[in-house]
Amino acid sequence: MTAQLVARLLLVVGCTVIGLALAGCSPANASQPHIYVALGASDAVGIGAPDPAHDGWVPRFGASLGPDTRVVNLGVSGSTLHQALAEQLGPALDAHPDVVTVWLAVNDLNARVPLDSYAQDLDALLAALEPTHARILVANVPDLTALAPYAGVPADQLSAEVDRWNLVIADTTARHGAVLVDLHAHWQEVADHPEYLSADGFHPSPEGYQRLAAVFSETYADGG
């Protein structure tokens, strides 16, 4: 083998290695998700924001995942978890998601869905999502005592009920290897920032949705 041929071979090998390295660093191959699916109710829809498609927490969180991320928002106002199993799970699986958020609990609690039934539905939902290998974030029930619609409910009774639900959500989430987004722990901020609520005293305002998106983003960045 001549020295000239050896030099050419080394050049080809070197260019190949460099090309592979550059390809591995390109945005197309980076470890950012490309499909984000949101399962939820009116909060996922963005009720309370004048421009839900922009100001809701779902589009804001989706934007934080990277410019190439496609957001599939399956939220339906008024949805319970059982309804989401029938209406949202199928499209979620069809989307082949990289990231999934689930915030479905408050409507169930308000509708007095038996906690055992809710637990079974959450177990079924997360079990169905597991084979996607998506990163799954599940939000719990916030501190409802801070919200005007619950003003007539004894605070200690409501807090105890929320704690029961959150324990089930935390246990089920952990059992399926999903990550808990602890909205309850952050809800004192609502009392400190009344501007986080819309005029109905229940749904977030644009500022509230921005903070919600930040909590999801922080949890995701922490390894969620």
Language model: regions and residue ranges:
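Cell-envelope and extracellular/periplasmic
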Residues: G75, S79, L104-A105
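Short loop/turn segments at beta->alpha junctions
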Residues: T80-L81, P114
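Conserved donor sugar-nucleotide recognition element shared by glycan-biosynthetic enzymes
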Residues: H54, L81, V162-W165
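Serine-esterase "nucleophile elbow" of acetyl-processing enzymes
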Residues: C25-S77, L89-H96
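Conserved Rossmann-like nucleotide-binding pocket used by diverse enzymes
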Residues: A21, V72, L137
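Secretory targeting and sorting signals
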Residues: T2-A28
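Alpha-helical cap/lid subdomain in secreted, periplasmic
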Residues: P67, A86-G224
